[in-house]
Amino acid sequence: MGPTIPPESFIDLLLDALCVVDRDGYVRYVSAASERVFGYLPEEMIGRRILDFVHPEDLEKTRQAVKEILRGELKPYFENRYIRKDGSTAHIMWSARWSEKEQIRVAVARDVTQRKRAEAMQAAMYAISDAANSSDSLPAMFRRIHQVVEGLM
């Protein structure tokens, strides 16, 4: 067997961001993938509250998930949205747990924004198809299609 490889040398190769957050919600560590996932360099996130980055509409459900994690519940598939540094929205899937011994939350964040866009497009295509097949008149069909397209914007 070869020499032991220090974790830092391969953690920064991960495509997903590894995050460590303390009990009070402050980021204590985030891997280099934070730039790809959140749009922030690690040093821009460390020391800040993780909730500062959460999309305002997702704050309450995120706070609830944090409470559950702090009670020891595992969260393998929690999704919420973050506001990237450039102002765009990132859809994030989290896998997280609490370490009572270390008093930290350890989580892996995966950017699922492209998947969410594809799902929205697929749902829109179904809705447009449904409108085309079920509308009684052209104006009604156009109104429904316009509503669907507007929802994508």
Question: Where do the PLM segments sit?
Answer:
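PAS-associated C-terminal cap
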Residues: 1-8, 61, 110-121, 151
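Sensory modules in modular signal-transduction proteins
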Residues: 2-19, 23, 123
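Per-ARNT-Sim (PAS) sensory domains and their PAS-associated C-terminal
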Residues: 26, 71-74, 78-92, 103
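PAS/PAS-like sensory domain cap-loop motif
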Residues: 34-45, 56
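PAS/Per-ARNT-Sim sensory domains
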Residues: 56-67
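Short loop/turn elements at sensory-signaling interfaces that couple input to output
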Residues: 93-108
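Signal-transmission linkers at sensory-effector interfaces
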Residues: 113-134, 139-140
